[in-house]
Every structure is written in C-alpha cells, then in structure tokens.
Amino acid sequence: MKFFVLVLLLVLQFFSNKALSQSEEGEFGFNGYLYDNSGIAITNSKGLMKLTNSSEFSYGHVFYNSPVRFKNSPNGTVSSFSTTFVFAIVSNVNALDGHGLAFVISPTKGLPYSSSSQYLGLFNLTNNGDPSNHIVAVEFDTFQNQEFDDMDNNHVGIDINSLSSEKASTAGYYEDDDGTFKNIRLINQKPIQAWIEYDSSRRQLNVTIHPIHLPKPKIPLLSLTKDLSPYLFDSMYVGFTSATGRLRSSHYILGWTFKLNGTASNIDISRLPKLPRDSRSTSVKKILAISLSLTSLAILVFLTISYMLFLKRKKLMEVLEDWEVQFGPHRFAYKDLYIATKGFRNSELLGKGGFGKVYKGTLSTSNMDIAVKKVSHDSRQGMREFVAEIATIGRLRHPNLVRLLGYCRRKGELYLVYDCMPKGSLDKFLYHQPEQSLDWSQRFKIIKDVASGLCYLHHQWVQVIIHRDIKPANVLLDDSMNGKLGDFGLAKLCEHGFDPQTSNVAGTFGYISPELSRTGKASTSSDVFAFGILMLEITCGRRPVLPRASSPSEMVLTDWVLDCWEDDILQVVDERVKQDDKYLEEQVALVLKLGLFCSHPVAAVRPSMSSVIQFLDGVAQLPNNLFDIVKARENVGAIEGFGEAAESLAEPCSVATLTFTEPFVSHGR
C-alpha cells in the first residue's frame, strides 16, 4: 500500500540569531500572518496552515524551527508553559470519522519513525509505549481505537510516550455559570480554540477547549497532576502532528501562540484566516448536469444493448471443471437458481450481511422452497478445498442445523443453497419485530436447540466443525419456532484431537473471543464464547456492544451483566420477558450465569458444549464458586486458582449421537 507522508517544517524568515533569541525567551506565535518578529513561515498567503492533504494513510508534522529551553539543567525542573491555538478538522467523506491531530513536545524536529492512521503521526507499532520516546502530547482524536482503550470517537487525551492516554475526556467544555458540560464535535467546519497550560510549582497540566466565539472556560476539560521533568529534556521542539487513514480528514492550524513562564498571548479571532469552502457538492452537481446533457442518449443505447446481450448470451453461463465431477450431486445449475429467485430480484431478498446477500426462491423442478446465499469468492486458489468442505458439511443431519443442500459456482461468485426457514432469523424477532416478541419459554427452547446443534458439530460428528459465526442473524426458526443454526459459510473442519490451522480472523464484532483476535486460530472454545454472548443477548434483548449506551457500565453486555450479578442479576432481563408472569426466574438466572461462564475471556475456563447441555438440562449444577471464576475475568492471573475446575468443566460429556446419511446445506461462506 502506498503511503503518502506530508511533513511541513516551519522555517525561519529572519536571521537565525534573532530566532534563537526568541526561542530562548520562550515566546512566539502567529495569528494568520507574521508578527512580533517570530520568524514563523506560513503555508499559504492567507496564513492557513494545513497539516494533511486528501491522501489516504498519510501524516503531517508542523514544528517551530528552533528548540524551546524547558529546563535550565539536565536534572532541573521543567518550567511552566502555556500555549493556545485554533484548529479545525474537516472530514473529506461526508462527516465520517477519520483520525485526529495532536499538539506535541518532542526531542526532535519531526517524528521520523511515526505511522499514519490510529498512530496520529506520533508513534508506530514498535515504539508506542517506549519510555525512551520522551514525547508529551495532547491528542484531539476523532476515531475510537480499542487497542488504545479510547472511550469514544470524539475525545481529548493527554499522552506520555504512548497513545494510551494518561487521562482523557469526551471533547467539550464546562460552562462558567453552572458547570454544565457541553459537547464539542471535533470534526466540523467550525474552528475550535485549545489551551494547554503546565504549572511547574503545582506539577499540574490543564487542557481546555471551547468554541472560538466564547471566552476561555474557568474549569479545564482535563487536569493531570504529574511532574513532566522526567519526560522532557533541556531543549525540546513543539508543534503539531496529524494523520489520515482509510477515511480522510483535513487538519488545519489557524493561529498559535506559546510562552514559557507565563500565559500565552490570546489569539485575535477577527484576524484568523478562513477555512476553505467545501465545493464538492457544487462541483458534483455541475459535472453531473453536463455529463447527463451530453451523454444521456448514448448511455441509454449502450445500456440497452449491453442488457440484451447479457440476457441472451452470458447470464446463464457457468463452467464445470473436472475436479467438480465428484461433487456433482451437491452442485445446482445456475439456471435453476436464477429462475427460482426470479433473477435474484430485490423483491426476493431475505437479508444481507458482511459476507453476502440471501434470496428466497422455489425450485421449479420440485416446488421446494430454498434460500440462496450469494457470496463473492474471487480467489481461485483454495476454491477446490472450499467446495470439498461444503460438500462435507452437506452430509450433516441434525434437527437443529439448517440443511445445506448444495452449491453453485459461476465465475467469481459462489451460491450456497439452504432449506428456507419460514419464520426467518432470531435477529428479526429480537430487534426488528417488537409486535412479535418471544416469551421466555420460546427463548429458552431456542437456546437449547442451538446448544444441541453446536454440540453435534463439536463432538458428535466424524470431524470437528467450528462454526465461527454464531449470532442471532444465523439462528433461523421454522414454523414451530424451533431454533436451527445455519450459515456455514465461515465454518472450518479439523480432525478430533487436532488443533485447527491458523487463518484470517473471521466472524462478527462482539462475538469474537479474545484468543481468536490475537492468534487467528478458531477453536470449539471460540464457538463456546460466541454462544455465551448469544445466550446473554437472547435473555437481555440487546446487542453485545452499545457504543451509545446511557452509561459506560452498560456499553459492553458481559460487563453489565457481571456488574448486576452482585446486586440483582435479573435486572438485566429483557422487559418483554418480564411481562410474562410465567417466566422462571431460576431458569433465567441459570442462562445469564452460564452465558458469563461461556464468554469468559480465558479459553481454558469455558465449558465444552457437552457440559453446557448438561447445565441447561439440569443434569449438572454450575460450580458454587462460579461468581469468583467469572469475576476473575477482570484479573486474568486470578484464574490460575481455578485451573483444575476449568479443566474438569471442559471435559466433553456423553451425549447420544444422531447419525443420518442424506445430503445437506446452509447459507453462506
């Protein structure tokens, strides 16, 4: 991937001795033009400093040309300092979140080993968190990165040698009258003023931001008590850094002042340069109008001819390779699927996800209702192995697995054919059809159904099948509301007693176990983790992660349920379930606790699916110290004390095996 690096170094416009004296005095600034003999060079004639352009994965640096003497001796104390600047972050992609900028104090003029994207041009994968960096920064971040424990996609943080902030807060300010907190959106067309002030005597670093038309608030947004002396050298460079990733933003500095041992001069807002106008909408309209007026007739003729040729010659074309002969009974003709789905019309669309669209249809030869998942698979390498696995999975027979009937391969597209489930997915009943709510008995039955199907995949077939994408959207319901696990598009096979090979991390956010995200190695235990999340989701009636939850404690489902266990675990139950007077509180509590058990972050602690079925059937009881085991997720080292219990719970149980010999299908790899 091609990276674009934009580095702007502020150069001196006057003599070097004059600039040196000013840096030693520790005061400089610009306000949209050169003044006070600061010698700062601007980036354009209007005084607007732009850190990044419209390139993807780029970063920009702007540094004052001369170092600032923060200490009088190597072992001395860092002097007090104050700086204020006006900045703006403008999205280039319809206000989508990109990446932010940072004010930085660095031992070098420029950060030669920095990276773009989430690293903000400050650090890279290797040196992030290295104590030898000697970098102090204040980030204005517009992207939430889980690896740095970011609270949201609109926050301000104080960073020392690492992008995991010492202290952070959602961007905003406190009103002077009553202390009310007001949010500020960092990405917009309106400039924002920031103040960063360090009191050497109190060893306190304060950060304040506010709209430029308002005075500086009395209460800072962030206040960190920390001696900066160990982190800063005698002389350091000050400046700004910003970065873009796949989503691009433009970063501007409109004005900036800095002072040692005093308060930085305020910026004259009336003399700031103007931000460039967003001309994208106007330009697009003009281009469209001209293009349509000149080429509408030609395009119409071209599309008509192309459509007719496509219908007549190529729409039903497919290639059958020699190696597919052995899978013949599992292969459908594209023509049959095309007719069954009425040409894959949108009116026949059942749903779509990250791995393909699903259409309903009826086979004309047998009048059988089917579901067809259309999957893009444009890599020829591995296609034969993939089709072989599909044919193998097609031989599965279990009442709680959706039948995979076969496949069709055409050019770079793959079609998986399943039994059609008339009631649709569990996801629809949990979130999209409030008028058709499920009572507790139905929910508990679905949980047991999915557990039975998953246990069959893990323990009762001739090979181990790891599903890798367990979630409500992949649990389908028949006319009797029986739950069936479907969509084997990501499934992996391995022999009993052997570990599966490492592959790309696949699945759905919120259901991926910690060890899978680290190692890329899926296992039956990672399936158990996802099943635990599914149990909690069915019981609580909410998604695994709610970025806009009413309180931080409710953002992550597992954390919320665990917190409530200490008080009353039943308070997390879906209100629609509570309306049913017949629901069994003891049964609900069992499912919630078992869900936390299965979703434990340490794989060795999780039970096997055989054990899960015994817990659900009441054949076995949950451990008496389960709360301590689950609570230990907050301190991974604490689980060592439960090692023997974890190993015994992970042993598979004896469950009757269901054996069938007819062919089988599902929707989607």
UniProtKB/Swiss-Prot annotation:
Its EC number is 2.7.11.1. Gene3D superfamilies: 2.60.120.200, Phosphorylase Kinase, domain 1, Transferase(Phosphotransferase) domain 1. Pfam families: Lectin_legB, Pkinase. One of its GO terms (molecular function) is ATP binding. It is found in: Cell membrane. Coiled coil: none annotated. The active site is at 469 (proton acceptor). Residues 1-21 form the signal peptide. GO terms for cellular component: plasma membrane. It is a single-pass type I membrane protein. Glycans are attached at residues 53, 75, 124, 206, 261. ATP binds at residues 350-358, 373. Residues 22-286 are extracellular. Residues 308-669 are cytoplasmic. Residues 344-603 form the Protein kinase domain. Keywords: ATP-binding, Cell membrane, Glycoprotein, Kinase, Lectin, Membrane, Nucleotide-binding, Receptor, Serine/threonine-protein kinase, Signal, Transferase, Transmembrane, Transmembrane helix. Its main location: membrane. In the C-terminal section; belongs to the protein kinase superfamily. Ser/Thr protein kinase family. PANTHER family: PTHR27007. This is L-type lectin-domain containing receptor kinase V.9. The gene is LECRK59.
